[in-house]
């Protein structure tokens, strides 16, 4: 299934402005349709990767992919503290090895190829040009400016192909924003994935570019941005067994066996679960932040629940004939007697989520956030639930929200330094509280006929428990609804009444 999206018997036709025969901004309704490019041009298995460049990525798996396994160890103490009641304290640990992890091998490179240095020069050129009233990062020979050979190649003429207009190059609004925001990774990814730009840089050295009509070589190698240029701008997903996990938990349980109409079990777990795979499925593709340092991804597992308390019980209420409190009236005792109250209560700390910024200052993966003047522990304390507008709730302190609805940049800001990641911060959302109660009674009619009555209240107190991010979720500080949620982890109160006649 992982490789099921690989190229097969499918062709696509397309035409983009800037491709050969389709000059940008020069097409009129009366003009003939620009020439269409076809990918692949023909089917002749085995399919060559080069036939799918600029069209789609590929997926594969390690030929020696191993089966994941978990090692578990535990020890505990158990003691009866009073009659019918036992306390057990236990430590449980486990370690997951060879966990399957699919990720993209085609990470964009901005370091060894000199693109980061050119990006910094482009930022400086832009600042100088804007001071002169020109909204462009092109080299204009002004004091302090330097030539930009990479961008000149990406936007300039190549063989018979003309140069791109300023709006598609040095004055492009998206590119200007990348420079202002320090998003060198986003800029590199935009150039690497576009035949319009990459083919002007590498020319007909890349077969896909030659097929598109580029008829001369370019000054840069075809793998300038990505290790596998035949999947330019796309992913080369590899399923591996590189990931791991660990779990350590302290469990305390109190059990009472049935005695005098009461039995119960209550347990509490304090635990910590870590992994380098922040995903809810091992077959889900989850890119490493950077292949240069896979240790950056070690953090809480998406299933990390630090505190969990559960209790369930059954209590025969002490009313009626033969019970502690009897009235002496057979009619009254039949009404108030024979009732059993039971329930299940669960309380747990919130699910973990990761803060993101939608900024790409290193590669095509999120670069994290910048936390100013606070520690992660301080930030966690500022998570609290309060009513919000339009049936939403806020799960953060109002101080964390700016006037535009995004995170307050004085506390939480996006990274802006090209080539440098921010902080990768994991937080825990609102806690969950779920009480389910039931009241039951056996009503004998004759020696052989009886009624059983059950009244069950799920989420008995109608207490909403809100969810943030979902399993393996992230929350963007750049969202205009930062700190808001409408998702609930539990449903509303539900009352069920059942009757059973036995004879």
Model-derived segments and spans:
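ATP-dependent adenylate-handling active sites, centered on carboxylate activation for C-N bond formation
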Residues: 1-4, 89
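Active-site region of glycoside hydrolase catalytic domains
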Residues: 7
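Short, solvent-exposed micro-motifs at the edges of structured domains
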Residues: 11, 17-22, 27-73, 78-503
């Amino acid at each position: 299934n992982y490789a099921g999206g690989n190229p097969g018997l499918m062709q696509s036709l397309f035409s983009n402005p800037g491709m050969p025969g389709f000059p940008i901004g020069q097409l009129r309704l009366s003009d003939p349709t620009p020439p269409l490019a076809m990918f692949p041009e023909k089917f002749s298995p085995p399919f060559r990767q080069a036939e799918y460049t600029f069209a789609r990525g590929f997926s594969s798996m390690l030929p020696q992919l191993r089966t994941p396994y978990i090692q578990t160890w535990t020890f505990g103490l158990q003691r009866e503290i009073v009659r019918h009641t036992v306390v057990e304290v236990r430590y449980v640990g486990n370690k997951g090895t060879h966990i399957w992890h699919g990720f993209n091998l085609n990470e964009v490179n901005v370091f060894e190829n000199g693109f980061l240095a050119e990006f910094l020069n482009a930022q400086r050129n832009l600042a100088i040009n804007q001071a002169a009233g020109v909204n462009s990062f092109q080299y204009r020979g002004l004091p302090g400016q330097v030539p930009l050979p990479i961008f000149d190649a990406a936007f300039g003429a190549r063989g018979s192909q003309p140069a791109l207009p300023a709006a598609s190059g040095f004055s492009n609004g998206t590119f200007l924003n990348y420079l202002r925001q320090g998003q060198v990774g986003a800029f590199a990814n935009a150039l690497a994935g576009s035949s319009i730009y990459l083919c002007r840089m590498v020319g007909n050295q890349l077969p896909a570019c030659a097929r598109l009509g580029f008829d001369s070589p370019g000054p840069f190698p075809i793998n300038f941005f990505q290790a596998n240029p035949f999947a330019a701008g796309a992913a080369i997903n590899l399923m591996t067994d590189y990931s791991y996990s660990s779990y350590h938990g302290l469990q305390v349980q109190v059990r009472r066996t049935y005695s005098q109409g009461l039995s119960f079990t209550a347990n509490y777990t304090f635990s910590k679960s870590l992994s380098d795979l922040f995903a809810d499925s091992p077959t889900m593709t989850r890119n490493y932040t950077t292949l240069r340092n896979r240790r950056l991804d070690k953090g809480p597992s998406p299933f990390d629940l630090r505190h969990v308390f559960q209790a369930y019980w059954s209590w025969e209420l002490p009313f009626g004939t033969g019970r502690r409190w009897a009235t002496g009236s057979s009619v009254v005792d039949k009404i108030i007697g024979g009732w059993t109250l039971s329930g299940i209560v669960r309380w747990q700390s919130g699910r973990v989520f990761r803060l993101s910024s939608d900024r790409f200052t290193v590669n095509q993966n999120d670069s994290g956030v910048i936390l100013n003047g606070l520690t992660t522990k301080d930030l966690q304390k500022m998570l609290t639930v309060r009513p919000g507008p339009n049936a939403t709730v806020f799960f953060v302190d109002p101080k964390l929200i700016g006037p535009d609805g995004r995170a307050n940049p004085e506390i939480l800001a996006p990274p802006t330094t090209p080539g440098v990641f921010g902080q990768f911060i994991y937080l825990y959302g609102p806690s969950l509280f779920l009480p389910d109660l039931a009241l039951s009674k056996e009503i004998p009619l004759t020696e052989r006929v009886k009624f059983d009555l059950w009244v069950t209240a799920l989420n008995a107190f109608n207490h909403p428990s809100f969810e943030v991010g979902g399993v393996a979720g992230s929350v963007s500080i750049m969202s205009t609804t930062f700190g808001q949620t409408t998702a609930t982890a539990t449903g509303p109160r539900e009352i069920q009444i059942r009757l059973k006649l036995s004879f």
